[in-house]
UniProtKB/Swiss-Prot annotation:
Disulphide connectivity of cysteines: 37-77, 73-129, 118-138
Name of this protein: Pheromone-binding protein Gp-9
Family assignment from sequence similarity: Belongs to the PBP/GOBP family.
GO biological process annotation, one example: social behavior
Listed GO MF terms: pheromone binding
Leader sequence residues: 1-19
CDD domains: PBP_GOBP
InterPro entries linked: PBP/GOBP (IPR006170), PBP_GOBP_sf (IPR036728), Pheromone-bd_protein_Gp-9 (IPR022354)
Length: 153
């Protein structure tokens, strides 16, 4: 079975690297535990937010709180199955290690700084589902800004 390296940061990086092409793609849909986590939380692919919705912040205005929470639960499920979260607690070191491995980011890279800032911003949240969605949204938004600034350079 192929190794499943999934966490919110990989979602974000995949989204950022090809944002225009992948903006309609559902967050996490390319990963092995996606379908399992959808089933565990009683959702379908149609219920999951697109990368574009989350990176732009539209998910907050276009959806009800229950939809936000359920999407967060799917994300948390995938993070937990990959050993990156336990309940509402991050394994920050493992998240960084996996992120660096997947992205090739080097120390001082703004993407790592964004990841660290997003983890710090959400670390005290107690609800594991809301925390997971906010983390993903934070990283996606930061990566979108970084991608835009790099295009203008």
């Amino acid at each position: 079975m192929k190794t499943f390296v999934l966490h919110i940061f990989i979602f974000a990086l995949v989204a950022f690297a090809s944002a225009s092409r992948d903006s309609a793609k559902k967050i996490g849909s390319q990963y092995d535990n996606y379908e399992t986590c959808l089933t565990e939380h009683g959702l379908t692919d149609d219920d999951v937010f697109s990368i574009g919705e989350v990176s732009s912040g539209q998910h907050k205005t276009n959806h009800e709180d229950t939809e936000l929470h359920k999407n967060g639960c799917v994300l948390q499920c995938m993070l937990e199955k990959d050993g990156l979260m336990s309940g509402a607690d991050y394994d920050e070191e493992k998240m960084r290690e996996d992120y660096i491995k997947e992205t090739g980011a080097q120390p001082g890279d703004q993407r790592i700084e964004a990841l660290n800032a997003c983890m710090h911003e959400t670390t005290d949240m107690e609800d594991k589902c809301d925390k997971s969605l906010l983390l993903v949204a934070c990283v996606l938004a930061a990566e979108a800004v970084l991608a835009d600034s790099n295009e203008g350079a």
